[in-house]
């Protein structure tokens, strides 16, 4: 879309993603003088322009970051208010948190989550508006502490279950078969040295560490920092105890 905005003529993108971020980018490009139609549908049409002009624009809240903070409350069985959020962008996520037994209350652009006991549930990643693959790993940390057995199926990316081995180091009971993980919840996780193998796996390790007994050391912060701004500071502000080490060894 960005390349097509300044290309000669008309560009048609078929099988386009339906994610809110795509719609938001189209709105920004239109505000800068481009002509984009169809964002939010499988077909997007872009009529390029010679130049774009400046504009003031507020991007939508990060739904994956919001989901991560909701999970931080759920995995620690806490109450937390997260905002600003657009609940419609988190529909599949909120449905699963509701299945888990969390209480969710919306107040304008804020969501308050309360969690006491987490029940097992199944999930399958799907393109938006389905369950986001970017929250599969963080949700698996939650399911590792749930009551009962859960099944997680990853349908979007290959090799996106590498965090399973790291959760197992913390005492999680998980069996893998292809792109499917079967998680038997345990009463407590145990702190351990772990490594985030990608952006969302790193966040999953931090969440697991919040709920674990003892100290958890997470490596792979180069991945974490690519998708979260000052994650540890935000979590510490609501009661976490996280220190960033220059050399965790």
What kind of region is each of these model predictions?
Residues 1-249:
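Short, structured segments at the rim of ligand-binding sites
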């Amino acid at each position: 879309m960005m390349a097509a905005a300044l290309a000669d003529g008309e560009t048609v993108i078929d099988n386009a993603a339906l994610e809110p971020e795509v719609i938001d980018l189209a709105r920004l490009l239109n505000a800068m003088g481009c002509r984009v139609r169809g964002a939010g549908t499988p077909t997007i049409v872009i009529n390029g322009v010679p130049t774009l002009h400046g504009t003031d624009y507020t991007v939508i809240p990060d739904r994956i970051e919001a989901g991560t903070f909701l999970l931080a409350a759920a995995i620690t069985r806490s109450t937390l208010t997260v905002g600003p959020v657009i609940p419609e962008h988190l529909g599949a996520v909120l449905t699963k948190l509701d299945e888990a037994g969390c209480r969710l209350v919306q107040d304008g652009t804020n969501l308050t989550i309360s969690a006491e006991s987490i029940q097992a549930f199944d999930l399958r990643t799907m393109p938006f508006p389905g369950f986001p693959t970017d929250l599969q790993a963080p949700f698996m940390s939650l399911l590792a502490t749930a009551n009962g057995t859960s099944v997680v199926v990853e349908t979007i990316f290959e090799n996106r279950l590498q965090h399973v081995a790291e959760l197992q180091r913390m005492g999680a009971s998980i069996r893998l078969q292809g792109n499917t993980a079967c998680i038997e919840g345990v009463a407590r996780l145990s702190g351990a040295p772990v490594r985030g193998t990608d952006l969302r796996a790193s966040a999953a390790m931090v969440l697991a560490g919040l709920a674990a007994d003892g100290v958890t050391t997470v490596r792979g912060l180069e991945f974490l920092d690519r998708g979260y701004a000052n994650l540890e500071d935000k979590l510490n502000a609501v009661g976490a105890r996280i220190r960033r080490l220059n050399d965790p060894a």
